């Protein structure tokens, strides 16, 4: 039985669901599709000539390089190593190029310098100042930025010329002006040159300048061409927004990298009264976290690092600021142009940052914070106030141009203290010197000078020792220029004095006279370095204790504030001698045999 074929009638079609019926496109969608197709065809037709030109240029360039390579490989002398006189003549630029230049502006080197070219003999490194080649005429050309052959490498003229950049179709020559220079004794300077087109249309987006011998000047001798570093050429309209390298102190803050003129970051800085690079650096020194928070999340950490690095290349002026902590101007801190801490003034004398010890740095840190909180009290030194004072002018110059001061040229200590006693405000200004070594009266000098005289020949008993010390005070004199042995950087007075006392005491205890003296008290002393020797902290012996060191230090500080001179130094010696005698007697008494009652 044959099955009937499915016959679809109009009635059945009408009964189909709405989703299965063939939809008729709307008129609007048909128009949109037609417009899209037409637009795509127009776009393809407009891009086709551009693609054809780019491809043809690249193919020509590749073929020319391939042809030059083949021609060079067939040549018996592929490279111009030496001329007929055995010299290797090369042109070199002696001026670095800036990272950016602008169309319509004068072509200049870094920081606006003139661009110089020299002809040298690579075998000797000397400038060729004689001969026909020293007066050659050179052509200035524009090269591609990706001409990355090193200057110490050799290349052929064809290879050099393959990187030359020609003007675009319908454009003027890329470089206009004095495109030829003539060497004079092997040296030449580029004249007035101007770029007429930017470098954004070539692959590397950068240009190089190159020089090569003009036609007719390189036939009888071989000279290798020269090229500069790559640089970008921008449209002259961008010069109004040009960044400065390095920035000047009074440049507007948007001259710094990553800060666009009238941008969001620039407006934030202006709102905080940060108008110039100087304002930026000062806040960076005083409170870098505040500056970072001010810029906010709109500046990434990488952008922040670039901006700060660029700002720190700024060349500072010679201004100084001093903040005094008292009315006598005996103590204060010194800052540079951007409020960086540069040194400490103590007792009317200037100590540079590099010469401060640990304790002085802690004190200086407190004073610096105090100065920043009360900056309106700081005094500005711009050189005008001190011009009438030749001594002060010389010392301020030494502050701006740091240099080491030897111990032999240090001033007499007593003279310095006499000057401090009669200082006025101007006198304190004269006291600002840039010396890496503090110059008050050093107590270790007294210890070094007089321990050498007294301790090796220590008397046989304590009373004779005291009398000899008192008599030596009258006969000895203090010489401020008789310096103690040089000390290490950052070593304090207490460390030097304690070390000196320890060494001299060890020598003293090893003498026969001291051994006999101690035996009279029943004390047995071992040599240094053995168990229970001098300087150990064991209870069975005595040593140089910290409290005694503190007494010496306090005495030094009190006496230092009272004055100076031979009388004061004599009293210091006498006190030290008496304290040492009392110390010896006390320790000897502790070691005396005691009678113990035994049941």
From Swiss-Prot:
It comes from the Eukaryota. It is found in: Nucleus. Residues 1-21 are annotated as: Disordered. Residues 1-80 are annotated as: Calmodulin-binding. Transmembrane segments: none annotated. GO terms for cellular component: nucleus. Keywords: Activator, Calmodulin-binding, DNA-binding, Nucleus, Transcription, Transcription regulation. One of its GO terms (molecular function) is calmodulin binding. Residues 150-273 are annotated as: DNA-binding. Belongs to the plant ACBP60 protein family. Transcription activator that binds DNA in a sequence-specific manner, likely 5'-GAAATTTTGG-3', to promote the expression of target genes. Interacts with calmodulin (CaM). This is Calmodulin-binding protein 60 E. It comes from Arabidopsis thaliana.
